[in-house]
Amino acid sequence: MSRPSATKARISATDLLDGLDPEQRAAVIAPRGPVCVLAGAGTGKTRTVTRRIAHLVSSGHVAAGQVLAVTFTTRAAGEMRTRLRELAATGVADPSCGTVQARTFHAAAMRQLRYFWPRVIGETSWQLMDRKFPAVRQAAQAARASTDPDSVRDLTAEIEWAKSRLIAPDDYASAVVEEGRDSPAPPEIFTRVYQNYEQLKVSGDTMMLDFDDLLIFTAAALEENAVVADEFRDRYRSFLVDEYQDVTPLQQRVLDAWLGERDDLTVVGDANQTIYSFTGATPAYLLNFSRRFPEATVVRLVRDYRSTPQVVGLANDVIGAARGRIAGMRLELVGQRANGPEPEFTQFDDEATEAAGIAARIKKLQARGVPASEMAILFRINAQSEVYEQALTEAKIPFQVRGGEGFFSRTEVKQAMGALRAAADRSDLPDDVPLDRLVRAVLVPHGLTEAAPPGQQARERWESLVALERLAADLAAMQPNLTIRELVSELQERAASRQPPVVDGVTLASLHAAKGLEWDAVFLAGLTDGTLPISHALGDRDGTGAENAIEEERRLFYVGVTRAREHLTLTWALARGEGGRKTRKPSRFLAPFLPAGSSTQRAASGKRSKTTRDHLDPAGEELFERLKTWRLATARDLDVPAFVVFTDATLTAIAEKQPADGAALVKIPGIGAAKLERFGADVLAVVNGGGVG
């Protein structure tokens, strides 16, 4: 395999560093060996890692064919390959960089398994299962478990979780108890389903492999066959793993098998964007990287090129309140863009008013030149989308639902609508039964229960049915004499009015589906306790399990905030329906940021939310005012908004805790190492009674 010339390498190495900030440059030129790049949201991660690969190749440290880069989505792998080809095509990097292998874990494993299979397994052939559903349904039937579609999908997801965590069927029951996990079926029943499923995949001289098996068999081949391992490790010498906070134990096992005793590994991630633990992902490997490799080079990318300083400031405060070991690795981002508008916090009386208010705000942004395709409404669960779909439809604003179907296009909603139509066509319905009771009676056989069922798919189906029941109740409340036939007609009209998805429309997406994306304007909607954090994260768990679940919800909120480039609006409603009891509370994650100054929006009712300073004693209130005076003077000196120095929430915490030294000050949410170094002495002087002005 040819190596690039020294002259070409020197030219390319110089060109590759052009336009990089100091931290990005440090990551690119870090020596071969264990390297950990902690990359915050918007910090140019993809640009950095592709240039690191190109630098290693162009500088002659490793040949392009000896590099394997892996990530978690086909889209991310494709983007990495495109960037490398562009660097090669433009002469910035060695031409061979365009041939570097950048794949998902599963794609890389399948390629390797096809090559090594005959030597490892022999004459037994294998086929990749394109769908697990039929096999899991058959396994469930044999185990006398539920075989309705949602149950089968939940059983499938649980098998995937168990395999990703390296949990064998016989170990499942003890594992779910140890991890405090809700099983979609009684553990002993699920164990039989899991066992049956694994047995069904083997038939004579043919094996069916699912995507997890690709990883399992690849790891086993390298672990158990020294000749195969030596050949693979001679081919691939240098590895890079993107989104390392989302790796599963099974993926780490494959990575360890690839590496052997070597340490030429670069990992990139942000533990505070860990939001997929329900799939088996764990940030533990990222958290322990320096422990495993004490000599590792660690680089922190903290310059945020995506969002305005105002959005970055809020994001820092959100994650600054995090607790637990993951929070110890948080990155305090530093906004690099010009100043923009302050994030807006808006309270509404009910959900419909909230959705209409968001639609009106979108109209205003459109009038100011923000394209619909550069705006997004993000929410915690897919079932929340209906009210926003309706508001956008009524406002004639185009939209698309990402990572899911439109509300009326979902299978469970279509089935429920069919049942309601059938009920409306009956002639034997009693006239004295209230419409809400009639609707509930129709929906109960389709899965509407008092409490959410276990299992992700079953819960999502239930959430859609609850949303449909609530929509029917709201329509009935607005029209007291509404009949079931009229209700069905109204629902059908709403379904028909939803325009087909359009590429250039406003994006509606769950927070999970929004990961990795960004927009000029983002609306984080429905931010009430029980929705974010989600009710089952609060649940009846206690101790570490409950704390971990709530902290993952906080990280999900953080991911939502960091999707916004410029305009960020956070909204919540006090009641579900118009005129309903205002029993809802804003998300607990909003508590430190509720309106306390002129920079935030008034609530829709015209009343301000209670400020976060109400609990301060007179001395604390006086200190808060002095801190505000200092902040204003400092902001003027730096020519930045006061929000960028410290938020009101941070000043309130300082006034409450009155830290005596830097060690105490840095523990306060919103004060990281950078702000401690920059403002710490001045703040402590104000706390001690002087230094204002």
Indicate residue ranges for each PLM-predicted region.
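C-terminal accessory/binding modules appended to enzymatic or scaffolding proteins
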Residues: 611-660
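Conserved helicase NTPase motor core
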Residues: 18-29, 33-38, 48-49, 68-69, ...
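ATP-hydrolysis module of ASCE/P-loop NTPase motor domains
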Residues: 31, 96-99, 118-199, 204, ...
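Helicase P-loop NTPase motor core
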Residues: 37, 43-53, 64, 294-297, ...
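Conserved helicase C-terminal RecA-like lobe
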Residues: 183, 371, 385-397, 406-596
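P-loop NTPase Walker
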Residues: 1-122, 126-127, 230, 284, ...
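Small-residue hinge/turn detector
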Residues: 669-672
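Conserved RecA-like helicase ATPase core segment
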Residues: 2-12, 16-19, 55, 249-348, ...
